[in-house]
């Protein structure tokens, strides 16, 4: 499973829409969509922020 799929799975488990996650992380909905479809790769800092918004950590994610 790749990063985008794992992020999408976590987001769905938390009952969040892409827009809600984007608002919490101060990112665009389009960027969240691109990451989930593996069209964009988040930096480590952005990935860490996204995971914090999803109640997870890098250690748990990988």
Language-model features and meaning:
Residues 5-23:
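Short basic helix-loop element that most often maps to the first helix and adjoining turn
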Residues 12, 37, 56:
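Short, conserved catalytic or interaction motifs in soluble domains
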Residues 28-42:
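Recognition helix of helix-turn-helix/homeodomain-like DNA-binding domains
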Residues 8, 44-45:
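Short, Lys/Arg-enriched C-terminal cap helix and immediately downstream tail that follows
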């Amino acid at each position: 499973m790749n990063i985008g799929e794992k992020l999408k799975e976590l987001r769905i488990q938390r009952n969040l829409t892409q827009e809600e996650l984007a608002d919490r992380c101060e990112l665009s909905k389009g960027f969240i969509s691109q990451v989930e479809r593996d069209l964009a790769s988040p930096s480590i800092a952005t990935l860490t922020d996204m995971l914090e918004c999803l109640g997870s950590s890098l250690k748990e994610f990988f």
